[in-house]
Design a protein with these regions (language model features):
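Bacterial lipoprotein signal-peptidase II cleavage site
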Residues: 25-30
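Bacterial N-terminal signal peptides that target proteins for export
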Residues: 2-12
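Hydrophobic helical h-region of N-terminal Sec-dependent signal peptides
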Residues: 13-18
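C-terminal motif of bacterial Sec signal peptides marking the signal peptidase cleavage site
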Residues: 20-23
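Mature catalytic domains of secreted/periplasmic carbohydrate-active enzymes
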Residues: 31-620
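A short, amphipathic alpha-helical segment
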Residues: 1-2, 617
């Protein structure tokens, strides 16, 4: 349980997601009951007892073996009561240092107190590290445990997964993905009719905790399943929605489209044989919206993917396996976050029964329905077990090995990474797979009628260019309304992006990261949907700011301001090799240029460009 603040102790007790490291208990895939059970893998925890430390005054040291180069949380285990000085706990591990109050605390089933720091430790390499803790507190043990976003599996499926991932089919699909660079994400469903408002109350004003994005309507208002289902009776979008959206994606310069075939609410936009809670059987539309959009996208020369919430299903997925996970976590004193789980009106079946009867079959249905499907974008993996995650991946591969699977299938079985919702990784981060950032055009994924905080075209282009320069893809979201119409402010920004991309496409499609991502501009990380909503966008750009991509013998320097005067690109100095030719993409005019020890000097006199910027192509 969570503990209230004690006198003299600066604890910021917060409800944050923190789950134990789980794996499937049974090898019998057909055994629905045992597939819901799981056991903890505390063998992946590093436990350092106080009695084993080398003590020097109030300093305690251990030698620590890091076997997995991932992100860890640091916890301190106290016996019974807190010490008055327990806020003064300093931890040093290798080059890392933690000097802050604890972020959360809880009691174990043995009545011990576990306190955890908010700061995490990211180890990039395996090996030995020295850990030192300096404190006068009467602690019992130090725990170094994998952060909940970095579960460590048993490894028993790794070789089989790797063989599939490295297959010619998967690698060809990844080559396509790396070249595509820019895709459209679509969050659309029953919730789109409500526009983020339920019975006159805006979702932002909901009294319940949890995300306030429009597609979480059912969760935000704890709407009973049968009541929420009534929305299906009025869901009747315009028949032109598919062609309109496909054309918008094409005009925006996007190469692929990914739509929510089933979000957390459990409603399917396709004609499912496994459930009648779908577009054909439950709505007056009486047609397969996924198939229609798929065909419209193919007609526009676009590739197609589907989002599928496999872990969360508020209609048929009971409590999302919450009770089983919580039982294990309670025994370890680990808080189990209920966010995203239906605890107000769960279906009477087990979560494993939902997987067997609905989720696994629907994945196979989608792949068979869409022969040229490019990828499945899984979501809601929080309490999915290692065995279940692998089964989803293998099911996709066995049905069509050309279909890519994203990271959120769970347990690191994805073919590529996603950086997180509206998150762009640092240029210094080392990622072991190709990656993608998904982002919004305002502050919601689904249609929120009152959210007019639209990102400007310049802001969206900045995110896109920043992502490309770091070697990733950008999956940019739209949220159509209940009729399938895209808000004009959102569509306008996408079309303006498309006009810029059309001129500068040589610097975009098929490019890779250059030796450095940018110059002139200090890195400002986009750190989540809520972060952008709260902080806004205040960045400005000058003629000294450039982002780089490369392809073959060419380096592209991308500017986000109009072409004017003379520019100096420092990173293209003589140290990079001899530049043989320079041109401005989209212009037929020759430019005067000179490569020096200081950089590449280019005169832009007489060059016309978009107000959103230009691209210098340097051929080596």
């Amino acid at each position: 349980m969570y503990l209230s603040k004690r006198k003299g102790i600066a604890y910021a007790i917060a409800l944050v997601i923190f789950t134990s490291i789980l794996s499937c208990k049974s090898n019998n895939k057909a055994d629905a009951k045992s597939n819901d059970e799981a056991f903890d893998q505390t063998s992946n925890w590093i436990l350092l007892d106080k009695t084993d430390a080398i003590k020097d005054g109030n300093s305690y040291s251990w030698s620590v073996d890091i076997e997995h180069p991932i992100v860890y949380n640091v916890q301190v285990l106290f016996e019974n009561e807190f010490s008055e000085n327990s806020e003064e706990v300093n931890v040093n591990i290798g080059e890392h240092s933690i000097k802050e109050p604890f972020n959360k605390s809880y009691k174990t089933y043995k009545n011990e107190i576990v306190s955890e720091f908010k700061q995490t430790i990211d180890f990039n390499e395996i090996g030995k590290e020295k850990l030192t803790i300096i404190t006068d507190a009467d602690f019992k043990q130090i725990r170094i445990i994998p952060n909940f976003r970095n579960p460590i599996g048993s490894g028993k499926h790794h070789e089989e997964w790797l063989a599939m991932h490295q297959s010619p089919e998967k690698q060809a699909a990844l080559a396509w993905f790396k070249e595509a660079k820019f895709g459209m994400f679509i969050h659309w469903g029953l919730y789109s009719q409500a526009g983020g408002i339920w019975k006159g109350t805006k979702i932002n004003d909901s009294a319940y905790p949890g995300p306030k994005v429009a597609e979480w309507l059912m969760h935000a208002f704890r709407i009973p399943r049968e009541e929420y289902k009534e929305l299906a009776k009025t869901f009747n979008p315009d028949k032109s929605f598919a062609q309109n959206i496909a054309k918008l994606a094409k005009d925006a310069g996007m190469k692929y489209v990914v739509i929510t075939s089933k979000h957390h609410d459990g409603f399917a936009l396709f004609d499912s044989k496994s459930s009648d809670y779908d577009m054909v059987d439950a709505t007056p539309y009486k047609a397969d919206a996924i198939k229609e959009l798929y065909e419209a996208c193919l007609s526009e020369g676009l590739d197609f993917g589907v989002y599928y919430s496999h872990g969360n299903d508020w209609n048929d997925g009971t409590d999302g396996n919450y009770a089983n996970v919580k039982k294990i976590n309670d025994s370890l004193g680990i808080f189990t976050h209920p966010s995203g789980k239906n605890l107000w009106d769960p279906s009477p079946n087990t979560h494993a029964e939902y997987l067997e009867m609905k989720a696994y079959p629907q994945i196979k249905e989608l792949i068979n329905l869409l022969p040229k499907l490019r990828l499945i974008w899984f979501d809601g993996e929080g309490f999915i077990t290692e065995e279940q995650s692998f089964r989803f991946y293998k099911l996709v591969y066995d049905t069509n090995p050309n279909v890519l699977v994203n990271k959120r299938v769970g347990w690191d079985f994805g073919d590529y990474l996603d950086a997180g919702d509206n998150k762009i990784p640092s240029a210094d981060e080392t990622l072991d797979k190709y990656w993608e950032t998904c982002g919004t055009t305002n502050n919601s994924w689904g249609y929120k009628s009152y959210d007019d905080d639209w990102k400007s075209t310049q802001e969206l282009l900045y995110y896109f260019v920043d992502i490309m320069s770091k070697g990733g893809n950008y999956l940019l979201n739209i949220g159509p309304d209940g009729l399938g119409n895209v808000p004009e402010a959102s569509a306008k920004g996408l079309r303006e992006m498309g006009a810029w991309i059309k001129v500068n496409q040589e610097a975009i499609y098929g490019v890779s990261r250059w030796k450095i991502p940018n110059e002139g501009q200090e890195e400002t990380l986009l750190d989540g949907t809520g972060h952008r909503a709260a902080k806004g966008f205040k960045k400005t750009f000058t003629s000294k700011d450039f982002w780089f991509t490369t392809k073959g013998n060419k380096v592209y320097a991308i500017s986000l301001v109009p072409a004017s005067g003379k520019i100096l690109i420092h990173s293209l100095n003589k140290n990079v090799g001899v530049i043989k030719n320079v041109r401005i993409l989209g212009s037929e005019k020759d430019v005067e240029w000179k490569q020096t020890e200081s950089g590449l000097e280019v005169s832009l006199t007489g060059i016309e460009s978009s107000k959103y910027g230009f691209v210098v192509e340097a051929s080596l």
